[in-house]
Amino acid sequence: MSARGPAIGIDLGTTYSCVGVFQHGKVEIIANDQGNRTTPSYVAFTDTERLIGDAAKNQVAMNPTNTIFDAKRLIGRKFEDATVQSDMKHWPFRVVSEGGKPKVQVEYKGEIKTFFPEEISSMVLTKMKEIAEAYLGGKVQSAVITVPAYFNDSQRQATKDAGTITGLNVLRIINEPTAAAIAYGLDKKGCAGGEKNVLIFDLGGGTFDVSILTIEDGIFEVKSTAGDTHLGGEDFDNRMVSHLAEEFKRKHKKDIAPNKRAVRRLRTACERAKRTLSSSTQASIEIDSLYEGVDFYTSITRARFEELNADLFRVTLEPVEKALRDAKLDKGQIQEIVLVGGSTRIPKIQKLLQDFFNGKELNKSINPDEAVAYGAAVQAAILIGDKSENVQDLLLLDVTPLSLGIETAGGVMTPLIKRNTTIPTKQTQTFTTYSDNQSSVLVQVYEGERAMTKDNNLLGKFDLTGIPPAPRGVPQIEVTFDIDANGILNVTAADKSTGKENKITITNDKGRLSKDDIDRMVQEAERYKSEDEANRDRVAAKNAVESYTYNIKQTVEDEKLRGKISDQDKNKILDKCQEVINWLDRNQMAEKDEYEHKQKELERVCNPIISKLYQGGPGGGGGSGSSGGPTIEEVD
């Protein structure tokens, strides 16, 4: 373990997140305060507080417009992005545009607030960091965070920014399937030598990734990635929700669609039923007073669930075929198939995949929800220099998910780095001018697989000026693409004759947060955190005075004290207790020191009487009883 303390691995998921740490030679997946090993990627804002994780998800039915989830679908994207526009139709919360970037709008403590997706993700990361710190009993500073293989540069950078806002040193951003492969590589360390082709099938709550890797002598190489950024467990839930909403309409002639709360309660029940159907062939759904006082009791069979999702289940095989084509492999050449993501527990999906690979056994040895965090934790240990023999021989090669290149004459895409190239990588190519005496060139950087740049995604552009006048085709302009281990791209253009150069780090043009933005968000995150803590302290003080009051009340009303305490003293205490109880009812939102003051007031009345009662006890003031009889203590 490094002197800086352990580094953690965080699987920042679309719907759920998970955190692990590598220590004592093995990975521990860390449970949260609710005992769950995965935590919902949800943040909720109320009139009084901010909630993250289970607490946020549990109250979503009551507070749908101020409960944010799916931040991963917004991060690193433009507001105008077609996927953002289509996703917005399905979200109960508002998304607004600020300078072309999406922000979520909520009401928090009675005020309208807006947050960038990076800020919401940083709140989820803060929760994961706190879960780890509670388990490890100390501060955590460094982490490896995972992203889908599909994430482009700006999405990776924005995820890294979210980690920075949290106050984490992000050691590296790695692909989720690569992380799962690391977990798998450790689990299967003892296999026979030789190269091994592994297919990773990752079907989570919100994204679907298929990756093919080769593993040889502890070296992982990603051969291909494919998938669908918009397929997962939630889509299966939606099918069930629509089906049951129709059933409700048929039975009760009522349409629940306009009622957000009813739909949300139905969705929660569907999610539970779906999980049940992975182990049972039937699940019952019982929702009291779903809509306009009508109860909804029904059941759904596994067969019906499979039928509702038949097309979605089948479509999961297309990326498998594409990944095989890209890796230039036949399905018979895949030695191992690894399941990742909660949705791979669905028996029908396992069967389709197994049949596709002619009955080959699937690897389910790793808990599918935890495999990614597991691998990230191992990678974090390697990066901070863990010398454990379990991780020593591991080397990690990642790839670019899309080809990267520049636009040349006529709008043609000229790739410098082909997709699925192992990173880090550096490629240089020489270009020239298109017209005589051209004094500047515009370098436009694109990612994508299409022949024309108009069909690809513009990452950024810059001008190289000051080229000496010359006939077309004479100047030599050297363009270099350099991708680091995090998949972040630097593009440089240099005029060979003058040595003049210009460069761009591909982030700015795509709405990357500025350093000032990040600093501001770090401060805000600190402020929200201290507000949350202040609220916790306030509630603790309220609970303390409440339980103290009721304890005292109970003590003096106890039959055993009959005759030991005068009626006058007894009434004095009971009157004061009642006064405090009435005050508490009226002041649910008082400040911490007001509650503490009330408790001291009550102690001043009670302590002298109580210590008189148990002779030999200390005189008033401290709130502690003596050794005889029941002790009454201040509640911390």
From Swiss-Prot:
InterPro entries xref list: ATPase_NBD, Heat_shock_70_CS, HSP70_C_sf, HSP70_peptide-bd_sf, Hsp_70_fam
UniProt modified residues of type Phosphoserine: 403
A Pfam cross-reference name: HSP70
Sorted UniProt keywords: ATP-binding, Chaperone, Cytoplasm, Cytoskeleton, Differentiation, Methylation, Nucleotide-binding, Phosphoprotein, Spermatogenesis, Stress response
Location within or outside the cell: Cytoplasm, Cytoskeleton, Spindle
Domains: entry comment: The N-terminal nucleotide binding domain (NBD) (also known as the ATPase domain) is responsible for binding and hydrolyzing ATP. The C-terminal substrate-binding domain (SBD) (also known as peptide-binding domain) binds to the client/substrate proteins. The two domains are allosterically coupled so that, when ATP is bound to the NBD, the SBD binds relatively weakly to clients. When ADP is bound in the NBD, a conformational change enhances the affinity of the SBD for client proteins.
Protein name: Heat shock-related 70 kDa protein 2
